[in-house]
């Protein structure tokens, strides 16, 4: 592990001892949120991203180490493992370089070169490569026997062997990689006959596309690969100057001007076209796809983070409405804890148009269930339903919000929803989800597969294993950042708490059901299978608002309770007094409480938590209204200024909901009056913005917007 620590430290430019401490904690079962929050002295204050990078790099090095063992044993079984080769492999920590070393020894399917070797033509190939023989014809005749028909057959077989050797030579491959790295071009052409198909229209921009690979953005590359997988596009990668590649390869291998050298030249041309170029193209296609995947996953994870940390309404009585025309609007009433109290359908819109009856029902329900806020899904009939709801007069002040429906239909048909509401259909479950999303987006969204939430960029085209790992880590990070009320949280929310997982989460819910609410964090140790390690990892992130010890409703870890108690004792007060009285806290000298294991970083965190125990890091929610005059694409005009909500962020800009079916695009160049390289630096998911309509493409239903000069 020490060697890995040194290597990771050099790569990430961090002190090796901090890397070693972090790896030790990770291998000891500590989670990333726990290490970041409660082990700052050991890590030197590394954040979750840095700890995640260390973990990822360590896992890659472990994989590479296992691969080296496989390579060594395979070559040893062949009897070809020399001390020099063993030393090279042992010292190699680059995956590409390792595969290059292994390539000549790698078991292959039957190749042309293998067939030529079987005919006994390897000595002839060696003779050609030496390029010293002046009487080649006489030498070649010696190989015309058995399966070798004539001199040309012998030379062809020898060239096949040379072509394979050249293509597997590390120098050849590195030369080609350098050429691709500097000047590779990615090109796409429409597959003949596909240009007129309606399904191909979305790829029109790529029917005749060409640009340097290093300039091809992740979203373009993923679009190209999707078009290729759908059979619409033919995508190729090649070096801009192929003649230069051939010239450089000739300098490496052609050392004379005789008949042997001419055969080597011919073999080299074949090696380039048939073996080397396709191999490096495949390598760069995979590398560029991997980079595009990483970028798309990063964008998705950041968008998901913003969505999960969206402002909550909090514990208020809410009416949730899943709007619709033909099937009507499904209405549910929830109490402040999100429990379903009532459900029914109303039809204020065509075709039934029972406006007056629907209005009476909504007004009556608001009064009957003391509704404080109404959440309306942003799908079909959303604008009409919003206008209908805001047009009524209620007996109290009622806030109206439009809530994203993305993933609600998937949740409503899921096993989770069936378990929660076995006696209700999908429409009721969907409306409940919409209402609960307003109350606490994080608690509700964790029940839905993150890929269904709709804030990704080509999420179905990227590496699904990496995507899931990244999104799970993002959800875990958000849940632990906010903290969880152990007495009200669902098992889905508890699953993401540091150190728990599905089994312990279910055990906590079962224990709570059988024994009533938890009264202290220590009581968690009575939960079946809750060991000391799991308790250490989860306790600081679980909150108990009604606990006798106020620290149980804070982010102060139980291991630090003695420190806080000592602080209170030194000031002749209780812990509760210390939390309530800012003046008392100002008298605390943190240096007095520094020990070998607890330093100023942890003590500073404790003091900040005492200032606002259990504080919610999420922002306050704001009411938003769309422009009442804009309902469809036909209502838009160039130059219009409109309010909107950011629904998705990509590398090339952001999409904004302006109250109609189609979202508008604000290109990255139109986000601000200054240069913007990363849209996420300027906007966030669900941000309220003002935009101006630049252009409308009615045929493709695309809207170009700008935020320039609008004081966002």
Task: Locate each region found by the language model.
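Accessory alpha-helical DNA-binding modules that contact the DNA backbone or grooves
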Residues: 31-32, 47-114, 119-149, 342, ...
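C-terminal accessory/binding modules appended to enzymatic or scaffolding proteins
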Residues: 13-14, 311-313, 476-510, 628-666, ...
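A glycine-rich phosphate-binding loop feature that marks nucleotide/adenosyl-phosphate handling sites
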Residues: 178-185, 321-325, 379-384, 403-410, ...
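Long, charge-rich intrinsically disordered scaffolds of nucleic-acid metabolism proteins
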Residues: 97, 401, 407, 412-482, ...
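Duplex nucleic acid-engaging cores and interfaces of nucleic-acid transaction enzymes
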Residues: 50-53, 64-74, 78-320, 326-412, ...
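Short, ordered loop/turn segments at secondary-structure junctions
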Residues: 38-40, 129, 240, 323, ...
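Low-complexity, acidic/Ser/Thr- and charged residue-rich accessory regions of DNA metabolism proteins
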Residues: 142-151, 209-210, 243-276, 280, ...
